[in-house]
Structure formats: structure tokens, C-alpha cells
């Protein structure tokens, strides 16, 4: 599929009030206008798109959906044919649902693990409209997508890899330097970053491990790092640089229990002409000062929505 990357992500949270302050004041997100049909939810902006992250009221903190952006209508329709040929069931969003997401067209379907995917094109935007919630030089999104996400899967199966590689058309990036079974994947049209999504094997567990966001300046990483430390927010990894990409980053936990990785490019990503097998996760730093799996990672029964669980029981 001709996919740019992740266009948006949606979460359910029992901590909306915490996100109202945390999003703008810690991360520098702009606060978007909630649709009239979803006034209870919180919509965040990191660029001129109508929104990139949505937080909906929920009983537990969990990933609700990942919106994958097709480059345009022709690519979207080709993607639907790909889903049909693979026997993947999908549901088209009606006019009201498209307006809710702020897109021209959208379909919903599941990956083999049960995570909710959406494929869309034509997200609403307003030029030069992004205003950060605090002094911040801004985020890198646009042609690379909103960022990357690492999710946990209770079973890492060949079916999952076939779905990601053959149906979604993602590129295989590698297994990283972790100790467990992990796969990193990149959308077909993303040539700016190493991966858009990774699946890590955690027997009996599901949920978001972390979300990675690129900022425009090293200063944004440093200032966010200072804010996190001054507020004594829980951290996963200290400032450091991974072995496989020339980026500076650190990880800290959000009010929903998953981590944000705040990333600045030291130099452009070098591409992946061959698969690497790094000896260590990082060249320097990235000291593990918190759990690798936060409270956002739970049992599948806690993380999956009721509709999906009911369908599995039938």
C-alpha cells in the first residue's frame, strides 16, 4: 500500500484531566477543537493538521486505533483492493465518521493481534495554524507521519508478519537490539525514519510500550527533559543515542502509562541498504531508570475493546 505513515492515533483514557495540562505544558502540543459530536474528547495538534492525537474517555488507558495515511484517493482504493484480496474484513466510515476523523474517506479493520487499524486519506489541515502549548520550535510530521509506535503482542506469528509485509506493504527494518522477539516495520513511502511501528513479543500481554515523536531542534529535547525532571515525572530511559540511527532521545511515562520518546535528528537517517544487528541498544546514555513495560501494557482482555472480544467468543 502507498502509505506515508501514521496520520493519527486515538487512545482511551481514564485520566483526561491530567492530559489537559500534560499535553500542552509538558509536551508542547497544541490543543485542537473537538468535533461537535465528540466534545468530551481531547484532540492534540503537533502541526497544521486538524489533529494527530485524540484522547477519549474510557474505563482503562489503552490504544483505541491507529490511522494509516494513504497518499491519496487512488492509493486508498488500491489499498481496499489489497484488503479484499487478502480476505481482511473492513468497515467503511460513513459521512459522520469521516467528519469525526477529519478525513475524506476512511475504513476500519484489525491486524491479526486485534489492534484497530484505520486507512484514510485527505486529513483536514490549515496552513500555518499550529500554535504550541508552550515555547517550542515544533514537531516533524508531514511527509514522515505523526511518529512511531511500539506495541506488545501476546504471540508473534508468521501471520502477523505476512499481514504487515504483504497486505500493508510495509518494509521490514529489523529486529533491533532487544532481548525478546521484536519486529520493526516502516510504511512504504516513508524514507525519513527507520520505523513506523514495531511489535514486541510479550506472552499474555498487550498494549502500547511507547510512542516516538520527532521535534525540530535539539533544544526541544533538552527543554522537555528539564520539564520532566522538574516535575518529577517517571522516566523510562535517560538521554541517549540508539545504535541504529543518528538521533538523540529520551523516554518518559505519560499519564496513560505508556512512554513518549522525544527525538531530535543529529543528522538525517542514513537509510537501510542492509539489515543491521547491533551489539547494544544505544551508543551512549539511555540508562534504564524505569520499567521497560509501563502500566499501559496489560492482559488482552483489559486492552481489547468489548466489541472485538464479543466477536472472538462467538
PLM features: residue spans?
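Short, charged/polar, Gly/Pro-enriched secondary-structure boundary elements
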Residues: 49-54, 114-117, 191-196, 257-259
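Vicinal oxygen chelate
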Residues: 5-14, 58-155, 183-188, 232-314, ...
